[in-house]
Amino acid sequence: MLQPKRTKFRKQHKGRIHGEAKGGFNLNFGSYALKAIEPERVTARQIEAARRAITRHMKRQGRVWIRIFPDVPVSSKPTEVRMGKGKGSVDYWAARVHPGRIMFEIDGVNDTIAREALRLGAQKLPVLTRIVAREDW
């Protein structure tokens, strides 16, 4: 699964996801892409599940690019632990996804396979998405 090799600090504040994506809203690599249309935090496990679903439907033809990276540490306390005694340990890593952000790009397969693969990948993600093609630009 994806996670940073090194970080400046071990833990971060929760934060909020405000506004549109400031970058990463154009197709740079592939012909078809999965674009987020709402703000959400996507975990490394969800990214990996979507990647597997996409590559499995493409039957290892073509190429997949992951355009988001989980760089936000999410901490949690164990169950049945009282409040206080500091912040919990890092549980998983997540990526903050803004509306308009391209999350996955694929190329090298025909239109129907590409759209179905991205639809299957979108089902694994907690964010509303739209499938976009290079012809739409």
Swiss-Prot record:
GO terms for cellular component: cytosolic large ribosomal subunit. NCBIfam families: rplP_bact. One of its GO terms (molecular function) is tRNA binding. Belongs to the universal ribosomal protein uL16 family. Keywords: Ribonucleoprotein, Ribosomal protein, RNA-binding, rRNA-binding, tRNA-binding. Binds 23S rRNA and is also seen to make contacts with the A and possibly P site tRNAs. It holds the Pfam family Ribosomal_L16. PROSITE patterns: RIBOSOMAL_L16_1, RIBOSOMAL_L16_2. It comes from the Bacteria. This is Large ribosomal subunit protein uL16. SUPFAM superfamilies: Ribosomal protein L16p/L10e. Part of the 50S ribosomal subunit.
